[in-house]
Amino acid sequence: MMISKKVVVIGAGAAGLMAGATAALYGASVTIIEKNKRVGRKIMITGKGRCNLANNCDVQTFINNVPVNGRFLYSAINAFTPEDTIEFFESKGLKTKTERGNRVFPVSDKSVDVVDTMHDYAVESGCKIVCDTANALILEDGAVIGVKCEENTYYADSVIICCGGKSYPLTGSTGDGYTLAKQAGHTIVPLKPSLVPFTSADKQCKDMQGLALKNVALRIVDKNSKKAVYSDFGEMLFTHFGMSGPMILSASSHIRDIQPDRYIAEIDLKPALDFEHLDRRIQNDFKENSNRDVSNAFSKLLPRKIIVPVLKRWGVPFDKKCNSITKEERHALCEILKCFTVEISGFRPIEEAIITSGGVKTSEINPKTMESKLVSGLYFAGEVIDCDAYTGGFNLQIAWSTGRLAGENSAYI
């Protein structure tokens, strides 16, 4: 009689559910330990609650979008590609759609549908999901033999750590996986926030808080090298602490070592108009308001909350009449609108980041199996590993792919 291998998975997020279900399908007896009462808490908030579950691209393009340890992921992504992910969800009855930037979402636009699909997949595969908190690994002779939790002790032939990072602690990502990994002797690369809002000492940000800019162009410039480290077109938001929104979160992942006032944001408020056409547009607006104060001539050109900050930077008296604005003053205004700058002071705390940069050192993990090189039977998957990507579905794909690979290999007798 064949005895199935016992596998314990710590964490029922994207990586954990995929790892557990895969191990069960390969014949293992699987227990998934989750400290929250509901699985997939972090999946629920991804993509603004819509769940950007993958990026519909080839493997090389995918790796190019992983600035931290992308090469480590070749085996995992090749074994379970973005195309495989899409086919997987479609086969489970979850219809998907591909939007701008090859971002894949459920047709329903509901992240709960992704969570429910993964939960059902794990349960139907034979996984037992228990609500408990893992406190320590049980190690013996260089191998892991179980997990000691608050309520019970679970013995196993293999253990997969899928606890996530340290961002969004309300979802359960409180850094538990790093503690367990350190207990096993693993090195933890220092943790930093990634996909996180910027802080700014510019007082005008607070004046503009709540202002959402759409269809603007953004450049993040390193003042030391004078080069742009990021540029894009899209949406951003001013807040009481600085800047947030889709482009800002994406930009943050391109800055590995944030230093106060080293980086500056350059915002083109009118990217659809070149300098000449913008100047002509402003001329027309001033003609329509020729006898009015210049401060009252921007209602058609700019959102209300940014008018005063622009006027202050321009330096022209607010009560100067439009018909007395000089060509030089008009050109100076165009320059401000084409390059509205905001100094960047730093990142918001890691607890507010979408993902955690840093984690278990990849050189201590076998990339072909996700097994620890230090402790036999110990595996890692998902955000706990020191791999993070740009926004656009890449980070969830890392979770699916590493979870799949870890689950498969953990089940082998």
Language-model segment annotations:
Residues 24-48:
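Glycine-rich FAD pyrophosphate-binding loop
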Residues 130-143:
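A conserved short coil-to-beta-strand element within the FAD-binding core of flavoproteins
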Residues 5-32, 406-411:
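N-terminal Rossmann-like FAD-binding beta1-loop-alpha1 element of flavoenzymes
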Residues 50-98:
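Glycine-rich active-site loop/strand segments that organize a redox cofactor
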Residues 130-133, 308-388:
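A glycine-rich dinucleotide-binding beta-alpha-beta segment and adjacent secondary-structure elements
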Residues 37-45, 59-60, 95, 187-190, ...:
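An anion/pyrophosphate-binding glycine-rich loop and adjacent beta-alpha core
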Residues 8-10, 33, 134, 154-169, ...:
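Short hydrophobic core segments
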Residues 3-5, 149-158, 231-232:
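Core beta-strand elements of the Rossmann-like FAD/NAD(P) dinucleotide-binding domain
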